[in-house]
A protein has these predicted regions:
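Mobile-element integrase/transposase regions
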Residues: 24-84
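C-terminal domain-tail junction helix/linker
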Residues: 179-229
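Conserved short alpha-helical interface segments
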Residues: 1-41
Length: 229
């Protein structure tokens, strides 16, 4: 398999600041899992799409690959600056991070378009079968991906435990990018280096294999499919 398929630099888009993006695999030691105290679920005042209550149980059970959780990691909260868009594949623990110019819907959607081009238009909905997001306004356009065959679900407000894997991965990223430190201080290459270190760690829950190894096997299966569409 061509390993570069998993973490190639995203192409620069003409006339915008996305040149510093990089598609990056992250993963983390399961031993660092923190217990989340569940809170009372509040009513959702915003409706960006399908609720997580309608998500098939098979996705939570991690029976198959291709189901993701999405989030953003911010630096300084004041002012406009870059953030990191992160996704974790639930079965393999494979983590993707993309540096984007801001915490807004347009930046998120351009990043997802980069991913669609990266993995291939014909295979995008096979690699990304579903994505579960929170109700942040940066994900307000995420349901547009359903046009490509991706199922989009939204967690309840103030219910981070419904995306526990992504939350855990983001906490590990904070070892490298502490809270309050600007994302602009880190290049795409530095973020990739952080990711490579974490990605190389075997996991007990994965049979002492790495997320990268398992995700590459998943991609091999996807790209071996005969898709006539």
């Amino acid at each position: 398999m061509n390993r570069s398929r998993c973490h190639r630099k995203a192409k620069a888009l003409n006339g915008n600041p996305f040149v510093d993006w990089v598609i990056t695999p992250f993963n983390l030691p399961e031993a660092l899992l923190r217990r989340h105290k569940k809170k009372l679920i509040r009513n959702n005042k915003r409706s960006y799409g399908t609720s997580i209550t309608e998500r098939p149980e098979e996705i939570s059970a991690e029976i198959e690959e291709g189901h993701w959780e999405i989030d953003t990691v911010v630096g300084k909260r004041a002012g406009k600056e870059s953030v990191v868009l992160t996704l974790v594949e639930k079965k393999t623990d494979y983590y993707i991070a993309i540096k984007i110019p801001g915490k807004d819907a347009a930046s998120v959607m351009i990043a997802m378009e980069v991913l669609r081009e990266e993995y291939g238009d014909k295979f995008f909905s096979k690699v990304f079968k579903s994505i579960t997001a929170d109700n942040g306004s940066e994900f307000s356009r995420l349901s547009e991906l359903e046009a490509y065959g991706v199922s989009i679900y939204f967690a309840h407000p103030y219910s981070s435990w419904e995306r526990a894997q992504n939350e855990r991965h983001n906490r590990i990223l904070r070892r490298y990018i502490p809270k309050g430190v600007s994302i602009d201080l880190y290049s795409a290459e530095q973020i990739l280096h952080f990711a490579d270190e974490m990605n190389a760690l075997p996991r007990k829950q994965l049979g002492y294999r790495t997320p990268e190894e398992l995700f590459e096997k998943f991609l091999d299966k996807v790209y071996s499919l005969k898709i006539f569409k």
